[in-house]
Amino acid sequence: GIYKNVELYGIRKRRIDNVHYIADNEGEVTFFTDVHFDFKRDDPISEDERLHYIVSSLPVGVQNAGKLESYQNLTGAKNFVNFHIPSPQLWYPVGYGQQPLYSYRVELLKGNQVVDSKEGRFAFRSVKLLQKPKGEAVLGYSLNINGEDIFVKGSNWVPIECFTGIVKKEKYKKLIDLAKKANINMLRIWGGGIYEDDYLYDYCDEQGIMIWQDFMFACADIPEEDVSFVEN
């Protein structure tokens, strides 16, 4: 059955569906904003509809951190904006460096009124999975973060309760803290489980723990002998 909150939203016109970003180690970051449109009716964009972006220029928690702002006219369902953060501080796994996180907020404006908003955090880091041939039958793998090879010390993460709806943030925090204390720097989210609560991913960001995310149904009984299924 349904085990999470059920919410009913009443909107007059538009809302922000999703915000995601791409950032590089030189401080360039692009935010992509998906805005909901009602395509069942004539729904033209008015001149006073804009997106207001607010981005921190220093990591969260740093005193006297400034902010960068940009107003962009709404262009449709897909929108984007570019920012440059001078001298960005890079995110590292625990044991290799700090975990600076920057903040952002996106507001959908109708005139001067905030119709909808979304906010979150982001980081600057590069990730490479390098494949290095070591022989005819052996292929070596190396995980590289910000140009530095990382020795991965990991563990599986399975649903922590049979009834997932009763799990509280405090239990996530306790188990992740124990993993960090055990010198673990990566958790593999098991493909036979669930997509975990956002809190798990956010707290791992803070603690420097990387996530290896399996696709769900990875351990399902897939009918590999069914030609039509495989070809689909």
Model segments located where?
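Secreted/periplasmic carbohydrate-active enzymes, especially glycoside hydrolases
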Residues: 1-187, 195, 206
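Charged helix-capping and loop-helix junction motifs
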Residues: 170-171, 230-232
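Aromatic-lined substrate-binding rim segments of carbohydrate-active enzymes
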Residues: 177-179, 186-231
